[in-house]
Amino acid sequence: MNSVQFKNHHHHHHPD
């Protein structure tokens, strides 16, 4: 799995 995909798939509960 690509690191970028992982970050994309990661659940972040903070506003961008």
Swiss-Prot record:
Does the keyword field hold Translocase? no
Q: Which UniProt keywords apply?
A: Amino-acid biosynthesis, Histidine biosynthesis, Leader peptide
Q: Which GO terms describe its biological process?
A: L-histidine biosynthetic process
Pfam families tied to this protein: His_leader
* Membrane found in the keyword field: no
Concerning InterPro entries, the annotation shows: His_leader
> Family, per the entry?
Belongs to the HisL family.
Q: Briefly, what is this protein's role?
A: This protein is involved in the attenuation mechanism for the control of the expression of the his operon structural genes.
Q: What is this protein called?
A: his operon leader peptide
Which species?
Klebsiella pneumoniae
| Organism lineage string | Bacteria, Pseudomonadati, Pseudomonadota, Gammaproteobacteria, Enterobacterales
Gene symbol of the encoding locus:
hisL
